[in-house]
Amino acid sequence: MSFDLPDIILRPASLLYKNIIRIRNRLYDQQIFHTWHSPLPIVSIGNISAGGTGKTPLVDWIVKYYLSLGCKPAIVSRGYGRNTKGVQLVSDGKTVLMKSNACGDETAMLAWNNRDAIVIVAEKRKDAVTFIIRRFAEAMPDVIILDDAFQHRQIARNLDIVVINEKEPYFRADMIPKGRLREPLINLARADLLVLSKITGGSTTAAISMDLEQTGKPVIKAGIAAGNLVCLSGMFNTAKESPVHAGIKALAFAGIGSPQSFIDTLEGQGIQIVSHRFFRDHESYTAKKIAALRLEADEKKLTLVTTEKDYFRMLGQPELQEILHTLSCCYLKIRPEFTEGEKLLKTMLNAVINR
């Protein structure tokens, strides 16, 4: 008799993890574990699966929306992949104070793209919020945005948004570590709003939408819209930003949660992917890896194209500074494009600050 050893190991581990999460949530539901209420309004954007849902572009969109209203938002993130500990001030709303190696690639990207927003990283979101209250006592932010905090129940929130990737068949997925689910799907009942991301508009969109509507929660639909292609001849040189020109032959590389979505977006813009290299989400690059990418691109006469998140990750790695001075590379800017429910989302975001 033969056994699938990985399945034998992973399935019980997933069951154990599921039970731990169930007990933890029950303790919060019964108020045995206490939830702290911030004096500042809180918006949480999270997911129920591990990475690749399109959460970060939505966080960026929400920050920009609040800024467009004349509000002062603060972003609180764990800062995945950083080499620091504790509460760290990434941006005071005027100056970005950290590189990505100290605050995480996604956090650095959010800080640089939203210079007027306060940005904090901390393992414990409550510590970050209390730091904001003390540090900015004379000029409090109008709203705090918790990045990736659906499972972080220590803080109460005024609006709880969960992002779900249409391309991932999560209704048939297993719990971590066998699968990618962070907690059972029944816990979507805690959310106030569901965002179905990376939609294609086909039968898959319709099927998942029907499943989500069974939760009784409002569902917003959003695809990924490609912005400009930002190209640098030498990663520290002035960037040249321009619309994507179809026909570019590329070597695409990325270390993100859902790399195939990146490839699909590039191909949707008419970029021809001749070769690609995928790395783990938040994986640090090495000079050897970058040199290999450049060599292959040069030999095949291809353009190196990556994600904006990977671009910021590379810029924050001290050991890459020498090779980046001469590396020609492009990154694609993206944003969510709402096909249904944008007005509802804005109404709910407005309600948070007008309470």
Curated annotation (Swiss-Prot):
The Gene Ontology terms for molecular function here are: ATP binding; tetraacyldisaccharide 4'-kinase activity
Q: Which domain of life is it from?
A: Bacteria
Q: Which GO terms describe its biological process?
A: lipid A biosynthetic process; lipopolysaccharide core region biosynthetic process
Q: What does this protein do?
A: Transfers the gamma-phosphate of ATP to the 4'-position of a tetraacyldisaccharide 1-phosphate intermediate (termed DS-1-P) to form tetraacyldisaccharide 1,4'-bis-phosphate (lipid IVA).
Which reaction(s) does the protein catalyse, per the Swiss-Prot or TrEMBL entry? Answer: a lipid A disaccharide + ATP = a lipid IVA + ADP + H(+)
Q: Which InterPro entries match?
A: LpxK, P-loop_NTPase
**Protein's recorded name:** Tetraacyldisaccharide 4'-kinase
GO cellular component term, pick one = plasma membrane
Q: Which HAMAP family match?
A: LpxK
The alphabetized UniProt keywords are: ATP-binding, Kinase, Lipid A biosynthesis, Lipid biosynthesis, Lipid metabolism, Nucleotide-binding, Transferase
Q: Which family does it belong to?
A: Belongs to the LpxK family.
Q: Does the keyword Kinase apply?
A: yes
Could you say which residues bind ATP here? 49-56
> Which pathway features in its UniProt record?
Glycolipid biosynthesis; lipid IV(A) biosynthesis; lipid IV(A) from (3R)-3-hydroxytetradecanoyl-[acyl-carrier-protein] and UDP-N-acetyl-alpha-D-glucosamine: step 6/6
Q: What is its EC number?
A: 2.7.1.130
Which residue stretches, if any, does this entry annotate as coiled coil?
none
